[in-house]
C-alpha cells in the first residue's frame, strides 16, 4: 500500500489518540507529510482563560492566487467504553471492507482524503500549478471551539493571508457518498424561561401562586405557530423545548418557580437579535399581566449563513457527479460546524464522507469511499487550477 493512499493516511491519523483537547500526534503527522511535500507549515497554539491550550496547523504551498483552502479538525470525541468496540477505537483496523476507529468518519478520514488528493495533485503538476493550496486544521472542533478555527483565521488574517474558497471535509452525506453538499448552516439560539410564582401548600392554593400553568402557557405561545415557512435554501426554523423543571420532589408543595429551556435552529430569515425580539414579543403577549417571567437568551456563535451557489459549488458538484453518478443536493441541514467561522474569511462549502456512524461505537468508513472521496477532491483541484 502506498503511503500516499488515503487508507494508509487515515490509519496513521486514527492511531493518534487525539481526543479533545489532546493533540495525540495527529497534527504532528499531518505537519510532517505536508512539509515533506513542500508546504510551509506552522503550528500556532491558542489559549483562553478557563480552557485548555490548543494546537492548530496552518500550511500553504504557493504564493499566488487563487487560494483554495482545505479545512478540518483532527480532534475526536471520546470513544466511550473501549471494550464495546469490535475493533479498538485507535487501532485503525480494516475488516470486511471497512476502516474502524474514532475519527474514521468525523473527520480523520476526510483529512486523509484531502491530503492524499493534494499529494497526488502535486505529483502530477509540481509546485507551480498556478495558485496556492492551504490546509487549515484545528484540534478544537469537538470541544469548546474557542481556541481553534476562529482564532486560527484571525491569526492568518493578521499575517496577510487571504483565501478565495474553502472546502471543509465534514461528513455531509447521510447514507451514500455523493448525496449532499452543505452550502450553509442554520443558526442556533438557546433560551431559558423562568416563571415566578409563590411557594405554598397544595391544600391552600389561594395562599400560593403556582408557576407551572403559566410556564405551560408561555411554552404553548412559542410552539403554537411556526416561526416561518422556510426560505429558498433553508427549511422552516424550528423551536424545541429541551427541559422543563421545577426542582420540586415534594408532592404537597406548590413550587416557587418553574423553568424551561429551549433551542431554536433558525434560517436566514432571522438574526439572533430579530429572532430574540420575536420570541420576547410572543411571550409578553401570552403573559399579559397574569404571568411573571424572566427570559435569558443566549445566542451561540452560530448565525445562519448561506454560501450562494456559484462556479465553485458547480465544480465540486461536477466532481461528485463524475465519480458517483449522482448530482448532490445543496443542503443547509444538520448542526453547526467550523464553517460558521470560515464564512467570514471566504466562501465555504462542506463535503466529506458518509456520517452514519460518526460519534458511535464502531465508527467506520468504507475503504472504497476513501478512494472515491480522494478522487473527488482530486477532480476539484484539477478543475480549480
Curated annotation (Swiss-Prot):
Its cofactor is Zn(2+); Co(2+). Pathway: Amino-acid biosynthesis; L-lysine biosynthesis via DAP pathway; LL-2,6-diaminopimelate from (S)-tetrahydrodipicolinate (succinylase route): step 3/3. PROSITE patterns: ARGE_DAPE_CPG2_2. The keyword Transmembrane helix does not apply. Belongs to the peptidase M20A family. DapE subfamily. GO terms for biological process: diaminopimelate biosynthetic process; L-arginine biosynthetic process; lysine biosynthetic process via diaminopimelate. It comes from the Bacteria. The keyword Zinc applies. PANTHER family: ACETYLORNITHINE DEACETYLASE, N-ACETYL-L-CITRULLINE DEACETYLASE. This is Succinyl-diaminopimelate desuccinylase. CDD domains: M20_DapE_proteobac. Gene3D superfamilies: Zn peptidases. Zn(2+) 2 binds at residues 106, 142, 359. It comes from Methylorubrum extorquens (strain PA1) (Methylobacterium extorquens). Its EC number is 3.5.1.18. It catalyses: N-succinyl-(2S,6S)-2,6-diaminopimelate + H2O = (2S,6S)-2,6-diaminopimelate + succinate. Pfam families: M20_dimer (PF07687), Peptidase_M20 (PF01546).
Amino acid at each position: 500500500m502506498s503511503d500516499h493512499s488515503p487508507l494508509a493516511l487515515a490509519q496513521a491519523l486514527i492511531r493518534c489518540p487525539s481526543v479533545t483537547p489532546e493533540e495525540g500526534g495527529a497534527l504532528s503527522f499531518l505537519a510532517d507529510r505536508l512539509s515533506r511535500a513542500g508546504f510551509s507549515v506552522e503550528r500556532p497554539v491558542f489559549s483562553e482563560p478557563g480552557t485548555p491550550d490548543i494546537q492548530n496547523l496552518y500550511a500553504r504551498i504557493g504564493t499566488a492566487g487563487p487560494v483554495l483552502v482545505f479545512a478540518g479538525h483532527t480532534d475526536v470525541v471520546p470513544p466511550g467504553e473501549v471494550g464495546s468496540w469490535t475493533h479498538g477505537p485507535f487501532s485503525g483496523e480494516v475488516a470486511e471492507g471497512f476502516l474502524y476507529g474514532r475519527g474514521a468518519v468525523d473527520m480523520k478520514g476526510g483529512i486523509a482524503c484531502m491530503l492524499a488528493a493534494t499529494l497526488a495533485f502535486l505529483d502530477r503538476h509540481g509546485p507551480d500549478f498556478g495558485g496556492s493550496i492551504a490546509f487549515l486544521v484545528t484540534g478544537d472542533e469537538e470541544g469548546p471551539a474557542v481556541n481553534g478555527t476562529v482564532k486560527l483565521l484571525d491569526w492568518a488574517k493578521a499575517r496577510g493571508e487571504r483565501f478565495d474558497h474553502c472546502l471543509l471535509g465534514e461528513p455531509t452525506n447521510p447514507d451514500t457518498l455523493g448525496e449532499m453538499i452543505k452550502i450553509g448552516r442554520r443558526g442556533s439560539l438557546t433560551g431559558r424561561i423562568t416563571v415566578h410564582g409563590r411557594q405554598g401548600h397544595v391544600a391552600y392554593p389561594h395562599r400560593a401562586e403556582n408557576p407551572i400553568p403559566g410556564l405551560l402557557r408561555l411554552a404553548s405561545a412559542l410552539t403554537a405557530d411556526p416561526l416561518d415557512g422556510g426560505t429558498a435554501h433553508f427549511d422552516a426554523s424550528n423551536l424545541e423545548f429541551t427541559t422543563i423543571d421545577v426542582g420540586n420532589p415534594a408532592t404537597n408543595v406548590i413550587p416557587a418557580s418553574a423553568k424551561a429551556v429551549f433551542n431554536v435552529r433558525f434560517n436566514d430569515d432571522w438574526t439572533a437579535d430579530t429572532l430574540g425580539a420575536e420570541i420576547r414579543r410572543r411571550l409578553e403577549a401570552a403573559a399579559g399581566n397574569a404571568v411573571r417571567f424572566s427570559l435569558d437568551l443566549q445566542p451561540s456563535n452560530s448565525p445562519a449563513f448561506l454560501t450562494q451557489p456559484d462556479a465553485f459549488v458547480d465544480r465540486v458538484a461536477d466532481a461528485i457527479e463524475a465519480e458517483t453518478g449522482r448530482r448532490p443536493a445543496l443542503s443547509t441541514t444538520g448542526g453547526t460546524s467550523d464553517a460558521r467561522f470560515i464564512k467570514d474569511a471566504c466562501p465555504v462549502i462542506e463535503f466529506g464522507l458518509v456520517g452514519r456512524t460518526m460519534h458511535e461505537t464502531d465508527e467506520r468508513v468504507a475503504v472504497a469511499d476513501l478512494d472515491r472521496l480522494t478522487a473527488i477532491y482530486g477532480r476539484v483541484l484539477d478543475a480549480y487550477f
